[in-house]
Design a protein with these regions (language model features):
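Alpha-helix N-cap and loop-to-helix initiation/capping positions
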Residues: 27-35, 65-73, 107-108, 145-149
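Conserved Lys-Pro-Asp/Glu-containing loop-to-beta segment of HAD-superfamily phosphomonoesterases
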Residues: 105-148
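Short aromatic-glycine-(Arg/Gly/Cys) micro-motifs in beta-strand/loop hairpins
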Residues: 173-196, 211-213, 222-226
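Short, mixed-charge low-complexity intrinsically disordered segments
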Residues: 194, 201-251
């Protein structure tokens, strides 16, 4: 399995993206958390099209956790991961507040994964096959773990799986990038008609600086994106670019 080619990564939250400060398996409260930056760093090296957090939170239905207290914590984890990875990878999440094991969205049932992949396709127009997805979690049925629900979720959904410890111990290559035009998302070619892709971040940065200085017109702006990035469809009711560029100058 080559995880550098996985376009969508589903990932558990408790014990995977975050740990308890108290050291207990389950948090004593919404405050009992710390980010697992070693996992964040590995995800950034992969730069998939999306990282989608899927989390069982049956304690909400049981009355152990108030949803008004949990939701800001969930949003905080999503925002931290989005900020760390960068804007070219979508970060989103869904949690199941129900404790009923038969509920279609409670892991190991694949409802959350099915929903989020469908929503990703709806919002971007990009179809991702299940074999191009990966699930990462800490409930792998290994010795000392409380269950195998994350592993079974991947099996029920139909994608590959990695335990979070195995994931963090992997030697991953540095991510590669391609240079695109902002106007249409197409890969830029050099003077010899070779696409500017499979570049390190420093190489991609140098290319963008050179192209921008050589083509100062606004319609010739460039940027670099991860190799797995694809052009999403245009959102509904998107404003159309004006033929004439209007510059706003402050009053003196």
């Amino acid at each position: 399995m080559d995880i550098t080619k996985k376009k969508v990564i589903f990932i558990d939250m408790d014990g995977t993206l975050i740990d308890t400060v108290s050291g207990k398996t389950f948090p004593e409260g919404v405050w009992d958390m710390k980010l697992k930056m070693e996992v964040f760093a590995q995800l950034k090296k992969l730069h998939p099209q999306a990282v989608l957090i899927v989390s069982n939170q049956g304690g909400i239905e049981l009355g152990h956790v108030h949803p008004a207290m949990f939701q800001p914590k969930f949003i905080y984890v999503i925002a931290c991961l989005q900020s760390y990875i960068g804007l070219n990878t979508l970060v989103a999440g869904q949690f199941c507040p129900y404790n009923d094991k038969k509920h279609p969205k409670r892991k190991p049932n694949p409802g959350m994964l099915e929903d989020m992949l469908a929503e990703f396709t709806h919002n971007t127009g990009i179809t991702i096959a299940k074999e191009d997805c990966l699930m990462i979690g800490d409930a792998s049925g290994l010795e000392g773990q409380f269950s195998n629900s994350d592993l079974k979720t991947a099996e029920n959904f139909g994608c590959d799986y990695l335990d979070v410890t195995e994931f963090t111990n992997m030697e991953l290559p540095e991510p590669l990038f391609k240079v695109i035009r902002l106007s249409d998302g197409e890969v830029v070619k050099d003077k010899d008609d070779n696409p500017l892709q499979n570049l390190t971040e420093s190489e991609a940065t140098d290319k963008v600086v050179f192209l921008t200085e050589s083509n100062p017109k606004p319609q010739k702006q460039f940027t670099y994106v991860p190799m797995l990035w694809e052009v999403p469809h245009e959102p509904e009711q998107a404003p159309q670019p004006k033929e004439k560029i209007i510059r706003m100058n402050p009053k003196k």
